[in-house]
């Protein structure tokens, strides 16, 4: 299988730090995985180690534009597996899963909160803010080092807009909505088209249609020549014709003829 060739991202996009740091075993996996991902042009999103049905290590990654195709996941898995085998960050067998962040993805960087402004979000604070730990509402972008959220359920006496300090956020993720699904599908289709074109598996988009000459386009158009109106036939059965016919049958001469 041909390896995907991600677009070369800006260095700052790859190096942007995450707001969440995993503890324990997940932190050891992070130390090994993040440099490999960056070298391939991907960003680490989250690492989760679970013991359900054996030990599973899930590594979420993405391109700098927020997309992650199946081919990307396979390429990362092939590159990362031997590196993890050598580093041996855990002392037992585990199953490695490479995945995209998903549609209702976690928000782990400042740029995530800016990119998904206008979508519904739920946030759990590591440090309570204004006596609350959980917030749900419309993401309204970033202001300084805080996330703007138009909070749901605010009373008439409360300001629905809250500013949540980024470094006090424990977990933030998007809420699944029709609008979010539509945007995610659009991003995914565009990323797939870009990948196929870069690999030569799909033709480049056709050039724009040739524009017409403005001088010609603005010239007044002449309409078709009007056809001549057909000559109206002379009446054939008038009173005069009938009288003349009667006289002809009687052998009379019409004195009006020859005038």
UniProtKB/Swiss-Prot annotation:
It is found in: Cytoplasm. GO terms for biological process: ribosomal small subunit assembly; translation. InterPro entries: Ribosome_maturation_RimP, RimP_C, RimP_C_sf, RimP_N, RimP_N_sf. Residues 243-253 have a biased composition (Basic and acidic residues). CDD domains: YlxS_C (cd01734). One of its GO terms (cellular component) is cytosol. The keyword Cytoplasm applies. Residues 198-259 are annotated as: Disordered. Pfam families: DUF150_C (PF17384), RimP_N (PF02576). Its main location: cytoplasm. SUPFAM superfamilies: YhbC-like, C-terminal domain (SSF74942), YhbC-like, N-terminal domain (SSF75420). Keywords: Cytoplasm, Ribosome biogenesis. PANTHER family: RIBOSOME MATURATION FACTOR RIMP. Belongs to the RimP family. This is Ribosome maturation factor RimP. It comes from Rhodopseudomonas palustris (strain ATCC BAA-98 / CGA009). The gene is rimP.
């Amino acid at each position: 299988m041909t390896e995907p060739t991600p677009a070369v991202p800006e260095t700052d996009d790859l190096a942007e730090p995450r707001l969440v740091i995993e503890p324990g075993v997940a932190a050891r996996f992070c130390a090994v995985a993040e440099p490999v991902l960056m070298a391939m042009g991907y960003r680490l999103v989250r690492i989760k180690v679970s013991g359900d049905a054996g030990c599973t290590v899930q590594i979420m990654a993405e391109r700098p534009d927020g997309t992650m195709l199946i081919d990307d996941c396979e390429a990362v898995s092939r590159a990362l597996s031997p590196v993890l085998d050598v580093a041996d960050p855990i002392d037992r067998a585990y199953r490695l899963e490479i995945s995209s962040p998903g549609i209702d993805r976690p928000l782990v960087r400042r740029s995530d909160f800016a990119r998904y402004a206008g979508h519904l979000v739920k946030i759990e604070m590591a440090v309570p803010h204004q006596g609350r730990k959980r917030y749900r509402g419309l993401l309204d972008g970033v202001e300084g080092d805080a996330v703007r959220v138009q909070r749901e359920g605010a009373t008439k006496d409360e300001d629905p807009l809250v500013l949540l300090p980024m470094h006090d956020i424990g977990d933030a993720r998007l809420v699944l909505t029709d609008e979010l699904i539509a945007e995610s599908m659009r991003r995914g289709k565009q990323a797939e088209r870009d990948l196929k074109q870069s690999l030569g598996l799909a033709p480049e988009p056709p050039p724009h249609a040739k524009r017409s000459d403005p001088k010609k386009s603005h010239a007044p158009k002449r309409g078709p020549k009007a056809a001549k109106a057909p000559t109206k036939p002379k009446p054939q059965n008038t009173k005069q014709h009938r009288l003349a016919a009667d006289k002809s049958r009687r052998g009379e001469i019409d004195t009006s003829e020859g005038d």
